[in-house]
C-alpha cells in the first residue's frame, strides 16, 4: 500500500507529534508499505530552522525506508498572531508542489494541528482521488481559546470555519482519546466517521531500567537523590510555576530534587521564578537527545503531568504513555474530569492531585518518597497498562486495519473525480 503522511512535524524534532509520526511511518515501512512524508523544515521546539536545513526551500531525504519531502517555512522564534498565520500559510503554499514528486497514494493521513494543513491535504486528496484521514492531536481553535493563546476574533472565526471544513473533507477522523470523540459528535460529526486510536509508545525502547548506576543521574549529580521529573513542552497549558512552588514546599527534605527538562528559552523564565522563590532544589535542563530518553526516564523516581485548571477537558498529553511504559509512578496535577486524569486513573499507574495546587503536589510527592512499596506498585501497574494498551505494534495494527478497510470499501465504487497519476512504478 502507498501511504502519504502529511505532517508539519517529523524527525529529527525530539518531542511532540514528530516522534510519533516518525515511528508510525517507519513502522509501516517495516510491514511492507511504501510511505512518503510531506513535512516542513525541522524547527521545534526552538522555533528556529535547524542549521543544516536553514536557507533551503526543498529537501528530499530517505530515512529508514521512508521518503521525506521537506519544504520551506517562514518562522519567527517569538511569533505574534500574524507570524503564526504566515507560518502556517507558508507551509500550505510551499508544500503544494510536493504533490508532483511521488506516486499516487492509496490513503493520505494528515496530522492536526496545524489546521491550515487541511487545505493542501484536501487538494491532494481530490487530485489523487484517494481518502483523507484526519489524525486529530488537538481540537482547534477551541483548545487555544480556552487557555488564552488565541484571542483575535477574526482568527477564531477563520479557524472555526476551517475546522468544520476539515471534518467534512475527511473520509475518516482518527482521535487519540474518547473525549475527542464526544467533542466532535457534539459538533455534528457523524459518529461512524470517527475512530479512536490512542497515541502510542515503543515499549521496547521505553522500558523499566534500574536507576542505580544510571549515567544520566551521574552526569547531573543526582546519585542518591529522589528525582521528580517533568520533561517536555513548556507552554501556557502547563503552569510549571506549580512545580517550582511544590519544590519549595519540600526544601526541608534534602534528598528530593525536582528536574524540569525543556526548551532552553522557556527555561529562562523558570530560572527567574526559581531564584525569586528560593527553589534551590530544582534542576533546569535543556531538552535531551531522544536516544537519552529511556535513561532519563529511568533516572526518575516520579514523573509529572502538569496542566492548568482551564485546560480543555479532552487534552491528552502524549507523555502519559511514555511515563507509564518507563515503569515510574505518575503524579498528575490535572483537572479531575479531564481526559488526562481518566487515562492516569484507568492505568492504575499514578495519583491525581488538584491542578495549580503546590501543596497538593508536594504532599503526594512526599507520600511517594516515604512509600517505596506504593511507588513500585504504581510503576508496575502503569507499565503493564502501557504494554496492553499503548504499544506501537497495537497502533500499527489498528492503522493498518483502518487503511485496508477504507481502501477495500472504496474499491467497490468509482470516485467522482478521475485518478491523478503523478508517476508510475
List PLM regions with ranges.
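N-terminal subdomain of nucleotide-sugar transferases
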Residues: 1-56, 60-61, 250, 418-425
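Carbohydrate-associated surface elements
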Residues: 41, 179, 200
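A short helix/loop element that forms part of the nucleotide-sugar donor recognition site in Leloir-type
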Residues: 51-58, 207-221, 416-417
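Conserved donor-binding/catalytic core segment of Leloir-type glycosyltransferases
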Residues: 222-238, 244-247, 259
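Nucleotide-sugar-dependent
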Residues: 238, 287-298, 303-324, 329-342
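Nucleotide-activated donor-binding/catalytic signature segment of Leloir-type glycosyltransferases, i.e.
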Residues: 253, 261-262, 267-294
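A short, well-ordered alpha-helix in the C-terminal region of glycosyltransferases
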Residues: 360, 367, 374-388, 401
